């Protein structure tokens, strides 16, 4: 029996590992921007395949672990958090000159309306690494379910949609990605550093977690403000900005839902219930 073309497309996994490694290890000098963007365009189906596999593995593992003791995974978790913290710090540092240089030299509006050299050279290399990293960050959830930590809708929804958006948007190179990527690098630099310290059993003041969540909310407020102004420019002026309507619509959907979910998380965690913790074990009575 012949399969539906869409089903066949989703089952036909094609990931050019050699090509991926060549771009990832190319380095910033003479970075092949066009080839980097084409890689994501050619492999967009991988994000849908990965999302389906991710859901099956995550919720399958959660079910499998329901009557079992949690894994500690101390050393792997320490290594994982350290890698993501170091990567995020490096990305934030490397992209800072281009971000603020564009604002200073071109103006605030132009910095999210136009691409300029955002995907060129060293900055382009780190943009590409950022987009690629969203596939690998799915592993974050595996640690949660194996250690029987709370798995919120916000967590897995955020991971899936960010990955899909990253791989879809980069080939089209919208100017406003400058803000989303740079701000995300900065926030993750703090967030994964915090996770690393906690996984190392290093005492961290309780207000730090609340501050990081607040920083995430500020990130999405800025992103939504940028998109709102671009929407105004697109509909009420003759501004010619560098983005496709489809990417803009997806970005609006993504950032507005993120803002709503993170505000709700903040209220539930720090205002109404007194705090949640990624590293707090699930009470045994909830494991049955």
Curated annotation (Swiss-Prot):
Annotated membrane topology: Multi-pass membrane protein
Compartment annotation: Membrane
One annotated GO molecular function: fatty acid elongase activity
GO cellular component: endoplasmic reticulum membrane
Superkingdom of the source species: Eukaryota
Key word Metal-binding present: no
Identification of the protein by name: Long chain fatty acid elongase 1
Annotated transmembrane regions: 39-59, 73-93, 126-146, 150-170, 180-197, 217-237, 247-267
InterPro entries given in the database record: ELO_CS (IPR030457), ELO_fam (IPR002076)
Organism of derivation: Caenorhabditis elegans
UniProt EC number: 2.3.1.-
One Pfam family cited in the UniProt record for this chain: ELO
Keywords recorded for this protein, A-Z: Fatty acid biosynthesis, Fatty acid metabolism, Lipid biosynthesis, Lipid metabolism, Membrane, Transferase, Transmembrane, Transmembrane helix
Pathway annotation from the record: Lipid metabolism; fatty acid biosynthesis
Assigned protein family: Belongs to the ELO family.
Enzyme class: transferase
Gene: elo-1
């Amino acid at each position: 029996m012949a399969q539906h073309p869409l089903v066949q497309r989703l089952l036909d996994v094609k990931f050019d590992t050699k090509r991926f490694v060549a771009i990832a290890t190319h380095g910033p000098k003479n970075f092949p921007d066009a080839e980097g963007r084409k890689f994501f365009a050619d492999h967009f189906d991988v994000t849908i395949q990965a999302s389906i596999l991710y859901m099956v593995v995550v919720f399958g593992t959660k079910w499998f672990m329901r009557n079992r003791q949690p894994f500690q995974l101390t050393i792997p978790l320490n290594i994982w958090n350290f890698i993501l913290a170091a990567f995020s710090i490096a990305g934030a540092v490397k992209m800072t000159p281009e971000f603020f240089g564009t604002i200073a030299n071109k103006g605030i509006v132009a910095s999210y309306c136009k691409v300029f050299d955002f995907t060129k050279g060293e900055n382009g290399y780190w943009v590409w690494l950022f987009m690629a990293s969203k596939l690998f960050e799915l592993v974050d959830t595996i640690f949660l379910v194996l250690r029987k930590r709370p798995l919120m809708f916000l967590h897995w929804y955020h991971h899936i949609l960010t990955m899909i958006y990253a791989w879809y948007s980069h080939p089209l190179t919208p100017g406003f990605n400058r803000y989303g990527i740079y701000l995300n690098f900065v926030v993750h630099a703090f967030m994964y550093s915090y996770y690393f310290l906690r996984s190392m059993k290093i005492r961290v003041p309780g207000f730090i977690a609340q501050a990081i969540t607040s920083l995430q909310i500020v990130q999405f407020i800025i992103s939504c403000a940028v998109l709102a102004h671009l929407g105004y420019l697109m509909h009420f002026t003759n501004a010619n900005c560098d983005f496709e309507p489809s990417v803009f619509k997806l970005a609006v959907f993504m950032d507005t839902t993120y803002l709503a979910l993170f505000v709700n998380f903040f209220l539930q965690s720090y205002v109404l219930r007194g705090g949640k913790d990624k590293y707090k074990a699930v009470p045994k009575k909830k494991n049955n």
